[in-house]
Amino acid sequence: MRVLRVKPGDLGEQFASDITDDLRHMFVAKASGQVVAYGRVIELAADEAGPGTPAGCYLSGVLVDPAWRRRSIATQLTQVRLRWAFARTDKVFYVTGADNVASLDLHAAFGFQEMKRFRSERSAAGEDVLSQLARAAERS
């Protein structure tokens, strides 16, 4: 399996809306020539991810094909995205629903620390969690 960064047009229309500008970066995991998972890094302005959220690089949207789950693909995608983001910045953020235990656990394993919680209509729990990872913590 390979994890690689893709650009607009690399995957046709399937992901065109996810990589519309220089602030959205798509990474895919391919097996047997087929995309089996993807994740993004999005550069956001202050408050764009939620009230009181900082500007910066945010990990976003890991999705793994159900037939390919439980193979550490989300972990591999996260490693590659972090390496890419830390080549550009000292801190990486992510926001997820407070009820998204799989995402919270995945990111905690990399050392992400919760910064704050805030009300959100995007999450079924009605609450999102903002977490941060500093470059030094990622390398330990």
PLM features: what roles do these ranges have?
Residues 44-59, 69, 88-90:
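A conserved beta-turn-beta hairpin within the catalytic core of GNAT-like acetyltransferases
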Residues 85-97:
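Conserved GNAT acetyl-CoA-binding A-motif
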Residues 28, 34-45, 58-63:
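Conserved beta-strand in the GNAT
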Residues 94-104, 121-123:
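Conserved beta-strand-loop-alpha-helix junction that forms the acyl-donor binding cleft
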